[in-house]
Amino acid sequence: MKREPISKEIQYQVFCRDNWHCRYCNDPVFFSPILKIFESISPGHEYYHPNGKSGKMIPLFANKFASVDHITPVTKGGENNLDNYVTSCWECNLKYGNKTHEAGKPQPNTIISSMNLKWDGLSSLYTKLLDKNDKWSDIINNS
């Protein structure tokens, strides 16, 4: 099976399902497009780099922006579907990469209960700070 691009709709669905927390380390994650807006509002503060490059972003943002990870990598027989996707901070995504559970990748933690949890990865700010609507804002506004 070939790894397919994960649509923005599916990414946002996974982030919301997992309550904007990394399923490996349980840390809250940031919605990376908001970091681009922060950088445009206050240039030179290293809030954002197009490739999330280490040393070019504030470590907190570089390590903890939200990404979707395959629990079982496609190259190891995993599928491209919601059951095989979890929210991962960029740090964990890089650390576990193409590993399987047998090779040291942990099983994803249980989804943190959303009860009394108001964290949204700063995604709600995205629609408020954006100059004009885009695909992400449409997804956020319609969810």
Positions of predicted regions on the chain:
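A boundary/linker detector
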Residues: 1-35, 124-143
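Short, low-complexity, intrinsically disordered N-terminal segments
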Residues: 18-20, 109-117
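The −1 position to Zn-ligating cysteines in a subset of zinc-ribbon hairpins
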Residues: 20-21, 67, 88
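Short Cys/His-centered divalent metal-binding micro-motifs
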Residues: 27-30, 85-108
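Histidine-centered nuclease catalytic patch
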Residues: 29-85
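Short, surface-exposed, polar/charged, turn-prone segments marking secondary-structure boundaries
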Residues: 44, 50-53, 94-103, 114-119
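Short Fe-S-cluster ligation motifs
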Residues: 50-68, 73-74, 114-142
